[in-house]
Amino acid sequence: MQIDSDLQNNLDTLKKTLGQNDDMMFYTFAFGDSRQKACLLYIDGLTENKMLAQYVISPLQKEALAHKECSIEDLSAFFFGFHHSVVSTMKEIEQLVFSGQAILLADGYRGGLAFDTKSVATRSLDEPSSEVVERGPKIGFIEKLRTNTALLRERTSDPNLVIKEMTLGKRTKKKIAVAYIQDIAPDYVVKEVFKRLKSVNIDNLPESGTLEQLIEDEPFSIFPTILSTERPDRVESSLLEGRVSILVDGTPFALIVPATVDEFIHSPDDYSQRWIPMSLVRLLRYSSILITIYLPGLYISLVSFHTGLLPTRMAISIAGSRLNVPFPPFVEAFIMIFTIELIREAGLRLPKPIGQTIGLIGGVVIGQAAVQAQIVSALMVIVVSVTALASFTVPSYAYNFPLRIIRIGVMISATALGMYGVIMVYLFVIGHLMRLKSFGQDYIIPIMAQPGQDLKDTVIRIPTMFLKRRPTRNDPEDNIRQR
């Protein structure tokens, strides 16, 4: 329905659809020499009243309009310098007013003006809680989309940085922003991102995690194929490598596509520290992943099937420690891993000081009590504890879950088939990873199949002076980053 030039007719129509809301405000006033009637529509609490008074009402009342104008564009000229747009239908008014904008309707004007006076409580910029680095920027994204895009603009002063906005959610009308560098990001990736976003048909988009599940390549895989981050510097570096970022209003977590398995293991401060220690740290992380997945399964297979592979003294020591334990190795390991997962989850849900105390005291007390009660052996406590510690070295929290799930599968296979079961799970996981795609790009590439340039920044990192080209696996338009 089009907006009529008669103000009273417009208000009668709007009050039928919006008037049942107690926080819906209809502020009427007069302006100009002819004292034309006007009305401001806004949601109390979503709109900054001082901005309305200073930038909307005051300029109108100061202008000496002698007669009614015939075009809403003429009225729009009085608000030069203040962000606003022209609306022409009642449906537009309903959508914009509930998103926090104020609508100006004036008698004699066929149309209205929408002013961006949204006022939403937000927190100040702070260090990301989920991606703490020893050296690097200490500022993370917040829940306000415009602040997040400004942080990107501030860090990337490249005129080729493109930020396009769109609205998702049939009812909530959630704003999202897609960021990419035009002369670096491959066109086919950008087109694929917009294609998937436009295919999303949902009532509400509460968080970027929901969007991630709607546009990912492999919804039935346990491995994430989209990287999420709170750090503007990480988004910046990804954009400069030819990736695309998606930011959602109301959440501090940005999405980065396409993502490879390396991205979940690397940390932002890998590039702010010297290359030798950081290369060793990366090797430590990759080793920790293997320990997280395979150590309990290897222990079970060696104790249950392949004791001949152990040194004689070690085999005797293990047998002695398990002499009075009533459970087989798998049950031992499962009890301890289940207990550690309980402690981990309790530590996350409880207030931070209490959670840290529960994690420390709970692990020590329960482990000691289990050994003294001869429910588990002391060596099993050591194995499970080392496994849990190794899992904490993975920078990506989302990548921890698949590793822990695979660990249970390795334990079951080791219990049934020994070392052959461990090898079978290993081959299955590698095959599954090689099958995965992330927005048309391979999720994992065998080391021997990677170009030499990409090998310089995978398991280890060579000096920055030699990283002159962008990773070819991202297929960037501009391949040179250092001349």
Swiss-Prot record:
Protein biosynthesis as UniProt keyword: no
Compartments it resides in: Cell membrane
Domain of life: Bacteria
GO cellular component, one term: plasma membrane
UniProt membrane topology term: Multi-pass membrane protein
Role played: Involved in the response to the germinative mixture of L-asparagine, glucose, fructose and potassium ions (AGFK). Cannot stimulate germination in the absence of gerD and gerK gene products (fructose and glucose receptors respectively).
Family: Belongs to the GerABKA family.
Protein name: Spore germination protein B1
